[in-house]
C-alpha cells in the first residue's frame, strides 16, 4: 500500500492505493460522512490483490484540505472524478459507503460513460426529501459524528471499542484515529469541522435518488445492512431502505444489471464489520463485467 496527496484545482486530496496486479477495471472507494479513506483498510488489501484500488479522503475529511464551501454532492463528485482522472483510473468501479453511496450514485449519473459499475453500500437509495421533519431528525442524529472534542486519545479509543453495534477488532483503532487530530495537549478534535458537517447534512437532506437513476448506464449493486434487531429506530430505517431499494430497481432502467444484496445482523459500517463478504460482492459485480 502507498499513500499520496494530489492537488485538484487548488484542493489537495489524500488517497491510499493497493496494487497487486493490472486486472481491469480499477476500483475507486468512497467513504461516508465524517469518515476517512482508512474505513477501507480491511477491504482494499483483498480487493487489490489483482487490480488497482484507490481510496480517497474527500473534501474536508481525513488528510485532505479543508474548505469553507463546496460540500454539495455534485461538487464532491467533481472532486472525486478529477482525482480519479489525475491518478489514471480509467472506467473505475465506484464503490461508496453511506453518504459516499449518495456520491457514488451521483458520480455514475453525472459521468455515465466514465464508470464500469457502481456499488452502493448501505446508502444511496433513501429519498431524504420525502421524509417528515421528525423522521429526518432521527436520521440526522444517527448520521452526525459524536462530539469527541476535548477527549483524550485513550478516552476516544475506549468509546470506540465500547460500541455495541460493531465488534471490536485491533484494526479499528487506526481507522477511528484517522478521523481526528491529536492536539499538543493530548486532546482530540474531529478532522471534519462541525460547520462542514452541517453543510453536508443540508445537502443530504435534499438528496433524492430518483434525480440520478435515469442517466445511470452501468451495472449497479446495492448492498444493505439489516440490523433490524437493534432497536425500533433501526427497524423503521430498514423499511425506508427497503422502499429505496425497490424504487432503485424500478428507476435504474438503463442499467444492464442491477441487484440488491442484504447482509443480515450487520452494522451500518459494513466495510469494517463484514469486509470479506463486501469484497466478495464487489468482485461479483466485476465478474458480471467480464461476462458482458
Language model features: what each stretch is:
Residues 90-133:
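Conserved hydrolase catalytic core segment
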Residues 1-27, 49-51, 89-90, 246-250, ...:
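Alpha/beta-hydrolase fold catalytic core
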Amino acid at each position: 500500500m502507498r499513500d499520496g496527496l494530489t492537488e485538484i484545482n487548488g484542493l489537495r486530496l489524500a488517497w491510499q492505493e493497493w496494487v497487486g496486479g493490472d486486472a481491469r477495471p480499477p476500483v475507486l472507494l468512497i467513504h461516508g460522512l465524517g469518515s476517512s479513506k482508512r474505513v477501507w483498510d480491511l477491504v482494499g488489501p483483498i480487493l487489490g490483490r489483482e487490480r488497482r484500488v484507490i481510496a480517497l479522503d474527500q473534501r474536508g475529511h481525513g488528510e485532505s484540505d479543508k474548505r469553507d464551501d463546496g460540500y454539495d454532492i455534485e461538487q464532491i463528485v467533481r472532486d472525486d472524478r478529477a482525482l480519479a482522472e489525475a491518478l489514471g483510473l480509467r472506467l473505475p468501479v465506484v464503490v461508496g459507503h453511506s453518504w459516499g453511496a449518495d456520491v457514488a450514485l451521483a458520480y455514475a449519473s453525472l459521468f455515465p460513460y466514465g464508470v464500469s459499475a457502481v456499488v452502493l453500500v448501505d446508502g444511496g437509495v433513501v429519498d431524504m426529501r420525502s421524509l417528515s421533519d421528525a423522521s429526518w431528525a432521527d436520521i440526522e442524529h444517527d448520521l452526525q459524528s459524536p462530539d469527541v472534542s476535548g477527549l483524550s486519545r485513550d478516552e476516544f479509543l475506549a468509546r470506540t471499542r465500547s460500541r455495541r453495534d460493531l465488534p471490536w477488532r485491533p484494526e479499528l483503532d487506526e481507522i477511528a484515529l484517522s478521523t481526528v487530530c491529536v492536539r499538543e495537549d493530548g486532546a482530540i478534535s474531529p478532522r471534519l469541522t462541525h460547520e462542514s458537517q452541517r453543510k453536508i447534512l443540508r445537502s443530504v437532506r435534499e438528496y433524492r435518488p430518483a434525480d440520478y437513476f435515469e442517466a445511470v448506464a452501468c451495472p449497479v449493486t446495492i448492498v444493505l445492512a439489516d440490523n433490524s434487531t437493534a432497536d425500533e429506530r433501526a427497524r423503521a430505517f430498514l423499511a425506508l431502505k427497503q422502499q429505496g431499494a425497490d424504487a432503485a430497481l424500478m428507476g435504474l432502467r438503463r442499467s444492464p444489471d442491477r441487484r440488491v444484496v442484504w447482509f443480515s445482523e450487520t452494522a451500518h459500517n459494513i466495510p469494517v464489520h463484514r469486509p470479506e463478504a463486501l469484497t466478495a460482492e464487489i468482485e461479483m459485480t466485476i465478474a458480471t463485467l467480464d461476462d458482458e
